[in-house]
Amino acid sequence: MSLVAIGINHKTATVDLREKVAFSPDKIHDAMKSLASRTRSGEAVIVSTCNRTELYCNNGDETDIIEWLEEYHGLEHQDVAPCLYNYHGQEAVRHLMRVASGLDSLILGEPQILGQVKQAFVKAKEAGTVALTIDRLFQNTFSVAKKVRTETEIGAAAVSVAFAAVSMAKHIFSSLSTTKVLLIGAGETIELVAKHLKDNGVASMVVANRTLERAQSMCEEFNATAITLAQIPDFLPKADIVISSTASPLPILGKGMVEKALKQRRHQPMLLVDIAVPRDIEPEVADLDDAFLYTVDDLHSIIEQNKASRKEAAEQAELITEEQSHLFMEWVRSLESVDSIREYRSQSMAIKDELVERALNKLAQGGDTEQVLVELANRLTNRLIHAPTQALTVASRQGDLNTLGQLRTALGLDKN
């Protein structure tokens, strides 16, 4: 078995490239089936978030997987390859465990990524691209992530990209008690944003979503107003802060719409935070004098503060992922030994069946019973000891004392 993890994230690539290799929710099912067809085991999971796209495969060729990624998105090798990272075996296992535990996140220890990895796993099972090894890998990973959160302080005062977005808003506006916020999207990230905003006493919130029912459901919890995406132009001029995170393949807010809203606001400043990949807000909005546009790549100062405060907890968590990845690989190796044992037993049984059948034929032809049984025992013994005898002979001739010692131990020759 050969586990491979290939990916791109916020540390290796800009948001421009990340959005080009991202997989939209409506296409990821077919993408996983396509990727799995390029592996020998048919096992593959794609984790695609605003900060990373990662491919986890069992028995896949690294070069072939990279070619698949480039072909799928229509990208040139020289544009993608320098930003990719890859892990094999235990390092691939440990990387997934670190990702799910929040140790590789833009904001150290953020809990949202675990839910995203779980969702990717569920989609892979629905696509039929999960078998024994990948299933065990992800189930173990979820247990490790839980262990990290319960046994370390990595989850204390848990933060996320949503937390960072609200922290930036607090930094720009001295108080949120008089600010009006427009949230675009109604997914998990925006729900976290709404929670942080409510905790900080924001004056009012409006939630715009493609599906009004989903927005209304969320608004009940946060005493907010729900609108459709088509109503955004009417509410945008009233917003001091706009935070957007949808799965839209095209921008939701264009420069023209924001420019018109700023004129209606008499050029009062507007903070826009785009935490979606692909981006929800056209980059050209940043050219407007009274618009202050930030993306996930602009949150580094908050992230660095977070990393510093959690360094000790992260070190403890790293030890857990190292230990657990080692244990998982022991299980993988045990599977390989099971296959070897099964093959050896099958081979031995085939020899036994062949010789017993030959002995029975001789008895049926009137052969002497004692002579037939002795011959059977001798032939069976010689056939079964042939392979280990050859191995002992080769090790002895080559002076390979280490192998010779291991063979003697395995054959029980040193017990007396």
From Swiss-Prot:
GO terms for molecular function: glutamyl-tRNA reductase activity; NADP binding. GO terms for biological process: protoporphyrinogen IX biosynthetic process from glutamate. Gene3D superfamilies: Glutamyl-tRNA reductase, N-terminal domain, NAD(P)-binding Rossmann-like Domain. Pathway: Porphyrin-containing compound metabolism; protoporphyrin-IX biosynthesis; 5-aminolevulinate from L-glutamyl-tRNA(Glu): step 1/2. The keyword NADP applies. It catalyses: (S)-4-amino-5-oxopentanoate + tRNA(Glu) + NADP(+) = L-glutamyl-tRNA(Glu) + NADPH + H(+). Its EC number is 1.2.1.70. It comes from the Bacteria. Possesses an unusual extended V-shaped dimeric structure with each monomer consisting of three distinct domains arranged along a curved 'spinal' alpha-helix. The N-terminal catalytic domain specifically recognizes the glutamate moiety of the substrate. The second domain is the NADPH-binding domain, and the third C-terminal domain is responsible for dimerization. Homodimer. Belongs to the glutamyl-tRNA reductase family. PANTHER family: GLUTAMYL-TRNA REDUCTASE. Catalyzes the NADPH-dependent reduction of glutamyl-tRNA(Glu) to glutamate 1-semialdehyde (GSA). This is Glutamyl-tRNA reductase. It comes from Shewanella oneidensis (strain ATCC 700550 / JCM 31522 / CIP 106686 / LMG 19005 / NCIMB 14063 / MR-1). The lineage of its organism: Bacteria, Pseudomonadati, Pseudomonadota, Gammaproteobacteria, Alteromonadales. The gene is hemA.
